[in-house]
Swiss-Prot record:
List of catalytic residues: E83 (proton acceptor)
GO BP, sorted A to Z: proteolysis
Name of the featured protein: Probable zinc protease PqqL
Organism listed in the record: Escherichia coli (strain K12)
Annotated keywords: Hydrolase, Metal-binding, Metalloprotease, Protease, Zinc
Gene Ontology molecular-function annotations: metalloendopeptidase activity; metallopeptidase activity; peptidase activity; zinc ion binding
Cofactor remark: Binds 1 zinc ion per subunit.
Any GO CC annotation of this UniProt entry: outer membrane-bounded periplasmic space
PANTHER family in UniProt: METALLOPROTEASE (PTHR11851), MITOCHONDRIAL-PROCESSING PEPTIDASE SUBUNIT ALPHA (PTHR11851:SF49)
Superkingdom of origin organism: Bacteria
Entry keyword Acetylation: no
InterPro entries, per the entry: Metalloenz_LuxS/M16, MPP/UQCRC_Complex, Pept_M16_N, Pept_M16_Zn_BS, Peptidase_M16_C
Encoding gene, per UniProt annotation: pqqL
Family: Belongs to the peptidase M16 family.
Length: 931
């Protein structure tokens, strides 16, 4: 009886403790009800998630729950090598037959078919239409053979060694060197430290087919696999495909995936990364701590707290930079990154102005110490919570339109980490309820927990010897930390949010003309001269896309301004509009479900706004204000201007950028290709930048608004006339630009400044079309280029094992009336002449041969699939209309593409190709070689 009473008292005490304010029973999280999971008799797990966007498309992913972490010391790189070999022969599809089979279905390697190897997993991905049942069956048969019947023929293995070596070589850039210098600090005491997926090239050079097969048989077993199906497919059909093709795999057991717990490195470390190609100088503080796996409500809250701390830091830092309180740095960020299966890192970084490392260190120390002393305010936290809840509510409303690839990737992550897959609705409701327990006090406790963590290191990044000499010593950093810990700092005052966007629009504007261009495609001309193209998509998206296309771009400006126009546009776009600051605009945009972006090119500027069909007005308000009431933040401009000057000063230290600039100047005889001098950049004020940006949209008569979405025309017309028709002509209109003047002489550029053991080769051939290239001709050239790209891949990447990737790209300049072909690849330095000669021989042979019926059929399938997706996607359809307008001066040209596709013949394609691509007017060749 006494024991029973003691147990009862203990249970009552435990329950009372768990129910205290701020404490939470670890309740399980609910799985998305749409997700179907199960396991076959042989141990293979599956996940099926029906998702109708885009229509008739499905993603099929095979996830092997093993990556480079499971490699033995003599296998470093084998997991990645095995992944490559899946595309080099299976029992039924030997050699390149796997890739050829995919291509015969109209699928493109890279876009529709891909694979990757990470530390924890190896994943094979195929995306294809669900309407082609025979192809679905064949793809599933390939997945079955990837799972159990790869061949690892010696000839294929030997050929792939060079491909992997070139992949390794191609990635040895400044980013790679920085990563290598950081790894011993960031990944200390983790298995990840010496298990990079790319592996060791000694292993790649010597591993035998038998060793590859042994690794494959050890890990590629059903109980170590998950098959993921996401898309517009009936769940019963998906399950039948899985069972029919994967249930017959032998029920062999894979080796058990081992776990290596990360040990804390509990002492402060100091790192300096000195690389001339670093774009900025800066200082950062990294913390390492256990990863939060979100499995229950308590971990859901904890993960949100860490995430909110990062967002609060970033928000405050940006506010202080934009307000002018932090003029000693040019930017900064905080982020959280996964560094091992069980560990993460939170870091806080600021970028120095010029090479002032002391100022940067002071700024970061002050920010951290201010939070130490005062934490974050209730107003800041409420703002972050409100903004996040708005994003989550928008995700609920827009869940039917989730990106298919991102959705599949999230499911794969859930499978890998064995965590619940939450629906958007559950995520929103949980956040609304559980975030109430996240308070200023709980965040302060979390912050102090982080700051007391001894597993940390300071990192300074410098790009020149002056900055390196100014880098702080460990003793100086420790002294500065102590100084700021004892310094009394003022609390940060949150500026609040203005969420009112006042638009003074003229409701009297009229439509002066209307024309039907095609079915569901209408052209309007407004009384202010602006043109509007209205289109409806074939899908059911509740999205409205508005794109303002100006026929003014950076080529409309003189040489002494041209290279600053894109920078000015970036500064204006980041400064808010009208009465809304940049931060207030982000909150306003979230609450009204709108997004905005802009892009300046040579002859055009695009301003794109996305809104919702059930509330389109904010989208029109935003684009009106961006054109008529744009503004610029002086401090944002100063930061961007400083960064541009520093980039110019250090251009000689970045060979790849210097090489690209030299090639650009070589191809044109035009001062507008030249870089500006430091004093020219410095003299361009914020007011100059704002004036230049406003000139891009200075005349409504030079703007075409492309509007795509399923909204009633009468409703749209009222918004169009009010918000677009009220845009007035500027007092300082800008003339349309002129194409760059082409260089008339052939040229060759060789730069021996590369820091990596790799050659970068670029060859531009220019062809004079004399007359504008129409859509049928462009389609013929594209079909040819697809076949040429395949030839280059087979001959250079695979047979010659000479390059990791080979790029073949055709572009048409409608204003200059010329066609350019770019051939680009990276390779072993001593082979660049050999491989360039081979590439040109391949092109000559392909020109003589033309394309075949089979190749044309593959191209037609590929394009038809793109057209099907495009016409159901609001965003893609809007982009297609814009491209049609820019390339052919006809917003309806794209409507002929499907019919033209059917009319294409081998004879017509080959005739067009020989007419336009047989005789280049100029050839410009460039090679970037190691020092």
């Amino acid at each position: 009886m006494e024991i029973i009473m003691r147990n009862l008292c203990f249970l009552l005490t435990l329950v009372a403790t768990l129910l205290l304010p701020g404490r939470l029973i670890a309740a399980a999280l609910p799985q998305d009800e749409k997700l179907i999971t199960g396991q076959l008799d042989n141990g293979l797990r599956y996940m099926i998630y029906p998702h109708a966007h885009p229509k008739d498309q499905v993603n099929l992913w095979l996830q092997i729950h093993t990556g480079s972490l499971q490699e033995e010391d003599n296998e470093l790189g084998v997991a990645h090598f095995v992944e490559h070999m899946m595309f080099n022969g299976t029992k039924t599809w030997p050699g390149n037959k796997v890739i050829e089979t995919f291509e015969s279905m109209g699928l493109r390697f890279g876009r529709d078919v891909n694979a990757y190897t990470s530390y924890d997993e190896t994943v094979y991905q195929v995306s294809l239409p669900t309407t082609q049942k025979q192809n679905l069956q064949q793809v599933m048969a390939i997945f079955s053979e990837w799972s159990n019947a790869a061949t690892f023929e010696k000839l294929e293995v030997d050929a792939e060694r060079g491909v992997i070596t070139e992949e390794w070589r191609a990635h040895q850039d400044a980013k790679w060197r920085t990563s290598q210098a950081r790894r011993p600090f960031l990944l200390a005491n983790t298995r990840n430290l010496d298990r990079e997926p790319i592996g060791l090239m000694d292993t790649v050079a010597t591993v035998t087919p038998a060793q590859l097969r042994q690794f494959y048989q050890r890990w590629y077993q059903p109980n170590n696999m998950t098959f993921i199906v996401v898309g517009d497919i009936d769940s019963k059909e998906a399950l039948a495909l899985i069972k029919d093709n994967l249930s017959k795999l032998p029920a062999n057991k894979a080796a058990e995936n081992r776990v290596w717990p990360t040990k804390a490195e509990n002492h402060l470390r100091f790192n300096i990364i000195n690389d001339k190609e670093n774009r900025v100088n800066g200082i950062a503080l990294y913390y390492r701590l256990p990863m939060v796996q979100v499995n229950d409500e308590q971990s859901f809250i904890e993960q949100a707290e860490w995430s909110m701390l990062v967002q609060l830091f970033n928000q405050r830092l940006q506010e202080r930079i934009q307000s002018g309180e932090l003029k000693t740095i040019s930017g900064g960020t905080a982020r959280s990154v996964k560094i091992a299966p069980d560990y993460q890192s939170l870091f806080f970084r600021v970028n120095a102005r010029d090479d002032n490392m002391q100022d940067a260190a002071n700024a970061l120390m002050a920010e951290l110490a201010t939070i130490d002393q005062h934490g974050f305010s209730a107003e800041e936290l409420d703002d972050v919570k409100s903004t996040r809840l708005t994003w989550l509510k928008n995700a609920v409303d827009q869940q039917a339109e989730r990106d298919l690839r991102m959705l599949t990737s999230r499911l794969a992550s859930s499978s890998l980490n064995n965590t619940p897959f939450l629906s958007p609705e559950e995520t929103y409701q949980l956040s609304k309820r559980l975030w109430q327990q996240i308070t200023v006090q709980s965040l302060a406790e979390k912050w102090q927990q982080l700051r007391k963590n001894q597993d940390a290191f300071w990192e300074q990044m410098v790009n020149n010897e002056v900055a390196a000499k100014k880098a702080l010593s460990p003793a100086a950093i420790l002294a500065l930390e102590k100084e700021y810990a004892n310094k009394k700092l003022a609390a940060y005052v949150f500026p609040g949010r203005n969420l009112s966007l006042t638009v003074d629009a003229d409701p009297q504007a009229e439509i002066s003309s209307k024309e039907t261009l095609a079915e569901n495609l209408t052209s309007l001309t407004l009384s202010n001269g602006a043109r509007v193209i209205l289109a409806k998509s074939a899908g059911e998206e509740q999205k409205l896309q508005i794109i303002a296309v100006s026929n003014k771009g950076d080529l409309s400006f003189p040489a002494q301004q041209k290279s600053l126009i894109a920078l000015a546009n970036k500064a204006v776009s980041g400064s808010g509009v009208g009465e809304l600051s940049s931060s207030s605009l982000k909150r306003w945009s979230a609450e009204n479900s709108v997004t905005m972006s802009s892009k300046v090119s040579g002859m055009n500027t695009l301003l794109s706004v996305s809104a919702r069909t059930n509330n389109p007005e904010p989208g029109f308000q935003l684009i009106n204000q961006r054109i008529t009431h744009s503004t610029i933040n002086d401090n944002i401009w100063a930061s961007l201007q400083n960064a541009q000057i520093q980039a110019l000063k250090t251009l000689d230290q970045r060979p790849a950028e210097k090489f690209a600039q030299q090639m650009y100047e070589t191809r044109y005889a035009d001062d507008r290709t030249k870089l500006l001098q430091e004093n020219q950049i410095a003299q361009f004020t914020a007011a100059d930048a704002l004036a230049a940006d406003r000139q891009l949209f200075s005349s409504p008569a030079d703007i075409t608004f492309v509007i795509v979405g399923n909204v009633a025309e009468d409703k749209l017309v009222a918004l169009i006339t009010r918000y677009l028709g009220s845009i007035k002509h500027s007092d300082s209109p800008l003339a349309a630009g002129k194409p760059l003047t082409r260089a008339t002489d052939n040229a060759s550029v060789t730069v021996k400044e590369q820091n990596e053991p790799v050659a970068q080769v670029s060859q531009w051939k220019r062809y004079d079309s004399r007359t504008p290239v129409n859509l049928p001709t462009r389609m013929a050239l594209d079909a040819f280029n697809v076949a040429l790209a395949k030839d280059l891949r087979v001959n250079i990447r695979e047979q010659a094992s000479g390059a990791y990737s080979v790029s073949s790209r055709l572009s048409v300049d409608p204003q200059a009336k010329d066609i350019s072909h770019l051939l680009a690849f990276t390779c072993q330095p001593e082979r660049h002449d050999e491989l360039l000669t081979l590439a040109n021989e391949v092109m000559v042979k392909r020109l003589a041969k033309g394309i075949s019926e089979q190749e044309l059929n593959e191209y037609q399938q590929n394009v038809q699939r793109s057209l099907d997706i495009q016409q159901r996607s609001v965003q893609q359809l809007a982009n297609t209309i814009v491209n049609s307008l820019i390339q052919y001066d006809d917003p309806a040209a794209w409507t002929e593409q499907e019919q033209l596709l059917k009319q294409m013949t081998v004879e017509n394609v080959n005739t067009a190709v020989k007419q336009y691509l047989s005789h280049p007017v100029n050839t410009y060749t460039g090679v970037l070689l190691p020092k």
